[in-house]
Amino acid sequence: MNPCNNITITPEIIAQHGLKEDEYQRILTLIGREPTFTELGIFSAMWNEHCSYKSSKKWLKTLPTEGKCVIQGPGENAGVVDIGEGQCVVFKMESHNHPSYIEPYQGAATGVGGILRDVFTMGARPVAAMNALRFGAPDHPRTRHLVSGVVSGIGGYSNSFGVPTVGGEVNFDKRYNGNILVNAFVAGIAKTDALFYSKAQGIGLPVVYLGAKTGRDGVGGATMASAEFDDSISEKRPTVQVGDPFTEKCLLEACLELMELGAVVAIQDMGAAGLTSSAVEMGAKGNLGIQLNLDTVPVREENMTAYEMMLSESQERMLMVLKPELEKQAAAIFHKWGLHFSIIGKTTDDLRFRVFHQGEEVVNLPIKELGDEAPVYDRPWSEPVKKTLLKAEDVKKVENLGDALLTLLNSADQSSRRWVYEQYDTLIQGNSLICPGSDAGVIRISNKSKRALAFSSDVTPRYCEADPYEGGKQAVAECWRNISTTGATPLAATDNLNFGNPEKPEIMGQLVFAIKGIGEACRILDFPIVSGNVSLYNETNGGAILPTPTIAGVGLLSDWSKMVTISGMQNGDHIILVGDCGSHLGQSIYARDILNIDAGAPPPVDLQLEKRHGQFVRDVIHNGFVHAAHDISDGGLAIALAEMVIKAGKGIKAKLSNKSPHHAELFGEDQGRYLLAVKPEALNNLKEYAQTHAVSLTELGQVEGDSLNIDGIFTLSVESLIQAYENWFPKFMGEE
């Protein structure tokens, strides 16, 4: 008798597995008996939020997922979008929040490893990575340790694997003190006629284990990722996986070689819930059963139980359904790369998930109910209470607006992230055109192609807290804007929805309205969601994170030689504001960090205006009218002007329109706006083009001198701006 299956199932054990009483009763009804301990673990893993999306699936179905360039939407390992010339971009963003809080280095590293596998499992070679990171308050005793560990883990894995990090975000807020967020994005390039999917096909075909050996690391990781934290957090350290980027690199090359051979029927990486999830997903999608023999699984630890082998989340592993006639050639490829290749089972026609260990059947369950027919909830939700818009006149104007700008540039959220991204290899593969520190990262598709891909990741959690619907819209719109500032056409997006406990109606309401806002923005901006991830129960001792629906997007440049950057402005260029002058100070960085107030509604997002302005900006870039472009977001016009000055090392002399109070015009965070550095000879053409396309422009000034001079308000030298901007992070990390 398998030792773990001698364990009596008690209410305590059921609760430890994250299953509710009604869910356990459903299991009893489904299988007509009490589950074994291993079967209970399998149900726990497959029915938790991390794998089943049981609280969010109803609402995720409302998102737009189709488009003229979409090849594969949600439901596969990653989304796939056509980029022409027989090629496609494969991409996804996924969270590794809970593990990264428990063990920051390995949690973040294996988050990168997992998303890399999601992409190359489909036949794509990874070409770009991003990460969106949220940490607690800078003065919290764990924050610096977590920042150091997470950044080191991301760099350690992605640098060793050999994928450039081209962008990302880092923010701080006390609401993340007990639950940091680590959202990792990877994109790869594949041939459109050589994509590989996870749907198993054919009866009696071998199921093959590929990659590294199985250990006890990560056992129960998927269940842990679907639960709130409490004071026992340190006890969960063993549920964090350990990664090896060099093995992953070998796995990439072996998989791509195997795919070239034509041996793959279906393939799935072993991520959350490990062998259980990969086997169940492949079988359930293909309406087939799967039978496994654990005696043939390569293990690195002695006396592993069936429970441990089925739920281990050891890294750098794949599961494949193989064409049997190519077994010898396939095995030779993996052995050449120093990886394990073991036939551990077969496909069957009985829709059962059966597992054998030491001559005993330890699992016999219906595969569809484990997989795509897992429970789905329509949880109660309450509509978020909307805040009223703040009038600029009701927000205090500080005496020295220049000092306010310097304070913001030297703050946790607005300062340079150079300390972070200089730990990442941003140039490996040799195709990076725009590196971190700009609105979007850009890479060439190849050194023989004029085409390039642009990437951005965005969300403003404080907006989402104040109004989840507008916050969801704004996250999409800002990502779309950032891609547009390079001249790239936004193609599609992936979402990473990070929220608290969905069993609380107010939290579920945040999720519902954020998804509604995301959906509306994606529909109007023609920016479909093709993949994604939901991370719930981001709470510690009942305190939830800020609602954080991260949006990462991809755009296409048909000719990268026409691309512009934030830093490209030249002396004599005209600085033009696209859109109206600032007036909205509700939920602004100015209100929060200068006045220490949290009040008012976030700025509303006019999606039709966003669409018109974005198309205009892309057109004038393609027409060669501008040297530089930058979107206006956190901190408003003042921060955007300062960032252009800092990046270019050149001054700007500008004058406000006086349509709003000075503090509102400088720091208002009105949406749908851009700054352009326009070539002098192109100014009239730009104005005419704006007039014919109903786009509002304001001439602010010109590029000149060595200071940011806002006429009659403040003059700040380029050097003082750079010093304020660059000093905060190194000082915070104790390097000054």
Curated annotation (Swiss-Prot):
It comes from Bartonella tribocorum (strain CIP 105476 / IBS 506). One of its GO terms (molecular function) is phosphoribosylformylglycinamidine synthase activity. ATP binds at residues 53, 92, 495, 532. It is found in: Cytoplasm. Belongs to the FGAMS family. The keyword Cytoplasm applies. Disulfide bonds: none annotated. This is Phosphoribosylformylglycinamidine synthase subunit PurL. Mg(2+) 1 binds at residues 94, 533. GO terms for biological process: 'de novo' IMP biosynthetic process.
